[in-house]
Regions:
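Non-catalytic alpha/beta scaffold blocks inside enzyme catalytic domains
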Residues: 2-270, 327-330
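Long, low-complexity segments enriched in small/aliphatic residues
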Residues: 257-330
Length: 330
């Protein structure tokens, strides 16, 4: 299960979790709706694209927490009521315009997330808009493409499990009665909680394929040698499968990738953004419209175990908080 914070992300709807256009579409957009996100914190590079588009005349609208995004925008409230109004008016003020919706984790990570997403989907259809989903975990889209999900939500999956293999997940407190095997590169919360630790390579110490927030598979190459007893993560999984008498059918990285490309062809399309089929919206009730959207991240510098183990990142985080506090006082 990869959907931490109980993120309501439907695995059969790639157009929703990976978007309908690449990030570069921001530059051509005339109207941008940001929903449940602070892109300045969650993705500064993407936020710079939004600012560039705004400087060229694009209209930016924010639905969610009021934030300093470095550019002007219309704040359309903290809930989905305004979207429903636009739907009822059939989007008449936005006809024949290039409209882009940027979804943040604030819309996914709520108890009624699936229903709230139906509001957004209906909104997109009404405006004939394009959509980009902004994820805060580098492995999220790739894990979704691998169908790395359970039949239940994240919390329920943890609750009914006795033994948990935790692969680099440090943002969730696992109950003490669970037996935890932790696989990761840095001694963060997950490692401190673990009963068994399997030291894996950091992303810079092994080759890998990452699928970014727009659904583009990207190949990364090893930049430096591993440290201590760390092993490449694919090799750890392979060795563990052998110990559990369910040996996986590959012996090296080439064999693994051949199997990966055969079963999940999307990973073979390196550096390409594939078009995704749109799943039509379903009906929603009015109850989800009044629920306020909350941003998930507030500190860009401490969003993952590698960043949290860095003295430089800790200093930047401290300085950023001081600047924010001074702005509040003034």
């Amino acid at each position: 299960e990869c959907r931490i914070f109980n993120a309501c992300i439907p695995p059969n709807d790639r157009a929703l979790y990976a978007g309908t256009v690449p990030v570069k579409a921001i530059s051509d957009s005339e109207i941008i709706f940001i929903i449940g996100s602070n892109p300045r914190v969650e993705s500064p590079v993407l936020n710079a694209r939004i600012r560039s588009s705004w400087l060229k005349g694009a209209e930016v609208n924010l639905i969610g927490e009021n934030s300093d995004l470095t550019y002007g925008y219309n704040h359309l409230g903290t809930n989905l009521i305004e979207l429903d109004k636009i739907i009822k008016n059939k989007g008449k003020f936005y006809k024949n315009r290039k409209v882009l919706i940027i979804l943040g984790q604030g819309i996914f990570c709520r108890t009624d997330g699936y229903e709230a997403l139906e509001v957004v989907k209906k909104f997109k259809e009404t405006l004939s808009a394009e959509l980009i989903s902004l994820h805060v975990a580098a492995s999220r889209v790739g894990a979704m493409d691998l169908n790395f999900v359970s039949d239940y939500d994240y919390k329920s999956t943890v609750d009914w499990s006795d033994i948990i293999l935790n692969i680099g997940m440090d943002e969730y407190d696992i109950p003490n009665e669970k037996f935890v095997i932790y696989q990761g590169s840095h001694g963060d919360r997950g490692a401190n909680r673990a009963d068994v630790i399997l030291p894996g390579c950091a992303f810079s110490e092994e080759s890998g394929i990452f699928v970014n927030t727009e659904g583009r598979p990207q190949l990364s190459l090893k930049a430096c040698e591993k440290i201590g007893n760390a092993r490449e993560n694919w090799a750890i999984i392979r060795a563990l499968s052998e110990k559990l008498d369910c040996t996986l059918e590959y012996n090296n990285l080439d064999e693994l990738r051949k199997k990966l490309f055969s079963e999940y062809p999307i990973f073979a399309t390196l550096d390409e953004v594939k078009s995704n089929s749109w799943v039509k919206s379903s009906k929603f009730t009015k109850n989800c419209l009044k629920v306020d959207l909350k941003n998930i991240w507030s500190d860009h510098y401490l969003t993952n175990p590698i960043a949290r183990s860095s003295n430089i990142m800790a200093t930047l985080s401290k300085n950023n908080k001081q600047i924010s506090n001074e702005k509040v006082k003034s």
